[in-house]
């Protein structure tokens, strides 16, 4: 009996047929395991245990028994054959992965047709494609897209995604989309081709602020074709064409919506002068009332200016001897007007805070301001505002380049009243044009000259830059009107061009100091050491 129990206790399952804790199943008995044999187990520790037999109750013997946990009751092969098979547990279905977003590859025709592609940051975001033929396609982005995923909140990510939807918007004009610069260049090339501009000017034209010469050539050709024999008053033809080129450049930039930060294309401003409101009262560019100051002019008797003064101003001109004992023509003006900051300065000299405005005859200057006001009222009778404004240039050819440095002398074009000789003899009853009657009733014109003009038979004061810029106030307004006519003949829509209003600034002050100017040098070191 004891030996049988020992056999049962020492019986261990064969290798590959299950572990000691788990009895082999029918699958293990019927077919050998296809898996490789497990690694060899380490040697089992044995312990001594006393076993008592039934026959000899007093006697005891020691037997070596392997140290194993208590085995389950063994089952024979017959019992295994009769025992029912255990049902296998079905493996739980693996969670299906979310389908990957569909990748739709654009066709080669669609890729070639797309000229501009951008993302509209709406909610949900959309992909906007602009085709070369003016076609505009708006496609809602899939929520799996990185752009759409970055804009979604945590609550929105839990919601199911919606299907893509495409909306096709056709350009009603069917015009290809171009940039602002290309739009301006296309209009400029059309004008230069039509009016036969020089090829060099046409090739170098890039719609830059300092490229007025090419547009002035367009205006010059248009004047020769449409307005041959144009009458100008105290205006040079070159200055008139230059101002037309500036106004045309302003219309081109307004048409193309191109702007430059520190450059105004017209170079002009609207000054509310208020010099024709009160009789005998003039105001300078500061907006202050100008003061009376005696002004004495001496000219050589044999000079052209001296002879002209004796003929035209015989009541004021007289021949006297100067301090060197020479005979000169002297004209004394007691009605001269100057800026309030020049009260302590001698004639033709200005302080550092002066605006540089000076009139030798205040009455003639006021007549000129009344003339331009009446001219504006005759030209635009229904205008509610603007009759009291003066269109004045702020740059002559000396300071027309962008980014120029201040130079010695006056920083704004000189404003001088010119009298219309023999205009008093005209019969106003025979003239029906109100714009012409403005000059008959007020026989003087405001003329804009170079900032620091150099007159004939005289030397330049200070050696500053000078040019032959000269245009009257009515002709400056006519230049703007003619540019509008030129534009209307070539384009259907006239863009809105705004001339800024003049405001006094310290940059317009008279400069008595000449600042050194540097010239660019390509060398890295100034000296050869």
Swiss-Prot record:
One Pfam match: Viral_DNA_Zn_bi
Region (Disordered): 1-107, 125-166
Keyword Zinc recorded: yes
Listed InterPro entries: Ad_DBP_C_sf, ADBP_zn-bd_sf, Adenovirus_DNA-bd_a, Adenovirus_DNA-bd_N_sf, Adenovirus_DNA-bd_zn-bd, ADV_DNB2
Main location: host cell
GO cellular component, as recorded: host cell nucleus; viral capsid
Binding site residues for Zn(2+) 2: 396, 398, 450, 467
SUPFAM superfamilies named among the record's database cross-references: Domain of early E2A DNA-binding protein, ADDBP (SSF47724), Zn-binding domains of ADDBP (SSF57917)
Organism: Human adenovirus C serotype 5
Residues given in the record as Zn(2+) 1 binding sites: 284, 286, 339, 355
Positions with biased composition (Acidic residues): 155-165
Protein name per UniProt: DNA-binding protein
Top-level lineage group: Viruses
Known role: Plays a role in the elongation phase of viral strand displacement replication by unwinding the template in an ATP-independent fashion, employing its capacity to form multimers. Also enhances the rate of initiation. Released from template upon second strand synthesis. Assembles in complex with viral pTP, viral pol, host NFIA and host POU2F1/OCT1 on viral origin of replication. Covers the whole ssDNA genome during synthesis. The complementary strand synthesis induces its relese from DNA template. May inhibit cellular transcription mediated by the interaction between host SRCAP and CBP.
Subcellular location per the Swiss-Prot or TrEMBL entry: Host nucleus
Single biological process term from Gene Ontology: DNA replication
Classification via Gene3D superfamilies: Adenovirus DNA-binding, C-terminal domain superfamily/Adenovirus DNA-binding, zinc binding domain, Adenovirus DNA-binding, N-terminal domain
Residue ranges of the region described as Flexible loop: 297-331
MF GO annotations: DNA binding; identical protein binding; single-stranded DNA binding; zinc ion binding
């Amino acid at each position: 009996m004891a030996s049988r129990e020992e056999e049962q206790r020492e019986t261990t399952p064969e290798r590959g047929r299950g572990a000691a804790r788990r009895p082999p199943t029918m699958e293990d008995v019927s077919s050998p395991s296809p898996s490789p044999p497990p690694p060899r187990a380490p040697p089992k520790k044995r312990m001594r245990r006393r076993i008592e037999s039934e026959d000899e109750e007093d006697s005891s013997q020691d037997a070596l028994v392997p140290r194993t946990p208590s085995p389950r009751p063994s089952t024979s092969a017959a019992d295994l054959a009769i025992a029912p098979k255990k049902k296998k547990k079905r493996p739980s279905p693996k969670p299906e992965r979310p389908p990957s977003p569909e990748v739709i590859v654009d066709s080669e025709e669609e890729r070639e047709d797309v000229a501009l592609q951008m993302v509209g940051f709406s909610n949900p975001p959309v992909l906007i494609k602009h085709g070369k033929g003016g076609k505009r396609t708006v496609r809602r982005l899939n929520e799996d897209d990185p752009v759409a995923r970055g804009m979604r909140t945590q609550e929105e990510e839990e919601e199911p995604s919606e299907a893509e939807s495409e909306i096709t918007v056709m350009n009603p004009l069917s015009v290809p989309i171009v940039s602002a610069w290309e739009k301006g260049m296309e209009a400029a090339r059309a004008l230069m081709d039509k009016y036969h501009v020089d090829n060099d000017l046409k090739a170098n034209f890039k719609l830059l602020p300092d490229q007025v010469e090419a547009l002035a050539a367009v205006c010059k050709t248009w004047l020769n074709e449409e307005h041959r024999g144009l009458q100008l008053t105290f205006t040079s033809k070159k200055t008139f064409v230059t101002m037309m080129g500036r106004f045309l450049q302003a219309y081109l930039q307004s048409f193309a919506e191109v702007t430059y930060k520190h450059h105004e294309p017209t170079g002009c401003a609207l000054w509310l002068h208020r010099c024709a409101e009160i009789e005998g009262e003039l105001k300078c560019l500061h907006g202050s009332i100008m003061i009376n100051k005696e002004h004495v002019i001496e000219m050589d008797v044999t000079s052209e200016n001296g002879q002209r003064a004796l003929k035209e101003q015989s009541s004021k001109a007289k021949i006297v001897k100067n301090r060197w004992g020479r005979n000169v023509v002297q004209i004394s003006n007691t009605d001269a007007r100057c800026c309030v900051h020049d009260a302590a300065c001698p004639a033709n000299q200005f302080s550092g805070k002066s605006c540089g405005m000076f009139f030798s005859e205040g009455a003639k200057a006021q007549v000129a301001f009344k003339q331009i006001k009446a001219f504006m009222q005759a030209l635009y009778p229904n205008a509610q505002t603007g009759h009291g404004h003066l269109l004045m240039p702020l740059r002559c050819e000396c300071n027309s380049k962008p980014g120029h440095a201040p130079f010695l002398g006056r920083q704004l074009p000189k404003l001088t009243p010119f009298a219309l000789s023999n205009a008093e003899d005209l019969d106003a009853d025979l003239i029906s044009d109100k714009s012409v009657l403005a000059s008959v009733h007020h026989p003087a014109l405001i003329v804009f000259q170079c900032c620091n003009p150099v007159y004939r038979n005289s030397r330049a004061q200070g050696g500053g830059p000078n040019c032959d810029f000269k245009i009257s106030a009515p002709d400056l307004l006519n230049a703007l009107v003619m540019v509008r006519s030129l534009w209307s003949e070539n384009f259907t829509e006239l863009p809105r061009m705004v001339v800024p209003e003049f405001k006094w600034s310290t940059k317009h002050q008279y400069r008595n100091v000449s600042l050194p100017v540097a010239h660019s040098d390509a060398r890295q070191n100034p000296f050869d050491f």
